[in-house]
From Swiss-Prot:
EC number in record: 3.1.26.4
Native source species: Shewanella oneidensis (strain ATCC 700550 / JCM 31522 / CIP 106686 / LMG 19005 / NCIMB 14063 / MR-1)
Cofactor binding remark: Manganese or magnesium. Binds 1 divalent metal ion per monomer in the absence of substrate. May bind a second metal ion after substrate binding.
Any one annotated GO CC term: ribonuclease H2 complex
Name under which the protein is recorded: Ribonuclease HII
Length: 209
């Protein structure tokens, strides 16, 4: 697992001449559901204004940008790892796996993959090994990573809304599966089901009672 913190001048020059995929994740901390990642290759000829870290945008703005990214991006793909995979691999390795799935699902082969954070897995696409860099706070610095953060965030939030409709007693639409007081009270009263991450301490403690 490679760790990169700076880009060379040659890397930066590559941005304007080659396809670059931005990758980000959402959902490492929640107690329930998949960890969701996205890979996005933007079209330099169709700029998208207002891209930023998805957490710094309002829900309304994220939704609008989600639609614009889907329309204008050269390629994007969502990758995920299930609660069972998270329990088997741990959340870090499951997140890396989900990122690899997002990149491998792109319809175009990027010359470079830029990942938000301080770690990057090894990426391949159609049998080719890809160069990659991780960039701390990249979701606020690199447009393609910002776009990936928005795609991943909106996708997972919609999935939590759907889970809320199926299990309204848990309040997923509000806390999105994160370990809030209201969520702890809900699982204490109603228990957990198969979408919960059984290796996470609060869930594991409940199951061991």
């Amino acid at each position: 697992m490679a760790v990169f913190k700076t880009l060379t001048d040659a890397d930066i020059a590559m941005f304007s001449t080659s396809l670059v995929a931005g990758v980000d994740e959402v959902g490492r901390g929640p107690l329930v559901g998949d960890v969701v990642t996205a890979a996005v290759i933007l079209d330099p000829n169709r700029p998208i204004l207002g891209l930023n870290d998805s957490k710094k945008l309002t829900e309304k703005r994220r939704e609008a940008l989600f639609d614009e990214i889907c329309e204008k991006a050269l390629s994007f793909h969502v990758g995920r790892a299930s609660p069972a995979e998270i329990d088997e691999l741990n959340i870090l390795h499951a997140t890396m796996l989900a990122m690899q799935r997002a990149v491998s699902g792109l319809k175009l082969t990027p010359a470079l993959v830029l990942v938000d954070g301080n770690r990057s897995p090894a990426f391949t696409h159609q049998g080719l090994s890809l160069a990659s860099h991780s960039i701390i706070k990249g979701d606020g610095l690199i447009a393609s990573i910002s776009a990936a953060s928005i795609i991943a965030k909106v996708t997972r939030d919609r999935e939590m809304d759907a889970l809320d409709a199926a299990y309204p007693q848990y309040g997923f639409a509000k806390h999105k599966g994160y370990p809030t007081k209201a969520h702890f009270e809900a699982i204490a009263e109603h228990g957990v089901f198969d979408q919960y991450r059984k290796s996470f301490k609060p869930v594991k403690a409940l199951l061991e009672r």
